[in-house]
Amino acid sequence: MPFLKVDKGLAEQMSGVQVMRPMPNLDLLLDKAKKYPIFGTKMRSVIYEPSLDGIEKVVQQQFDVAKQIISKGFMPIIEPEVNIDSAEKHECELLLKADILRNLDRLNDDHQVMLKLTLPEEDGFYQELIDHPKVLKVVALSGGYSRQDACDKLEENPGMIASFSRAFTEGLSKQQSDKEFADTIDASIDKIYKASQI
């Protein structure tokens, strides 16, 4: 299912977060995207510290852009990544979930979004988001966890499905033969798929 990356990268870190850089040409990009079989969009911010002001800015920006994307007929993936090396990762997740819920409740009844979130410290932590009527799907990003750790965490969070890139490519090398490369890819797909089925 095709998704279009629409963000222009991250701004400098302030208030414990990195918001997205401005996207002045987003409407033009989305109008061009209508010519292709694109289902939705993706855009990433990063949270490092449990800063109430910083996390509110991240979530507000993500939802503001998401509404713009919905108005053009696409499904937005909202991706406020919590850095896995944060010393206060769970505290970040508590603030993030509360702010996402507030913004979901403000969406029009006929609007839905997808959420792409870092695997949480607490098992089943995002169940309330998974069950929310304005959320189409909650997908998990590996965020730098090893494939094994990411899959283990995913198994403890039923309802989330994998959207791993870093964990997926773990073990791949240009020095591998075609068979070794294909075998590594197959093993990665199998492991991640099984973890998503729990």
Labelled PLM ranges:
Residues M1, D27-P37, K67-G73, D105-N108, ...:
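Acidic (Asp/Glu)-rich catalytic clusters
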Residues K5, K42-R44, G54, E88-E121, ...:
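Catalytic beta/alpha-barrel core
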Residues K5-A11, R44-Y48, E79-D85, K116-E122, ...:
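Active-site beta-loop-alpha junctions enriched in small/polar residues
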Residues Y48-Q61, E88-H90, L94, P120-I130, ...:
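Active-site-adjacent beta->alpha loops and helix N-cap segments on the catalytic face
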Residues M75-P76, K137:
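Short, proline-centered helix/strand-breaking motifs
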Residues D109-I198:
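Catalytic-face loop-and-helix region of soluble metabolic enzyme cores
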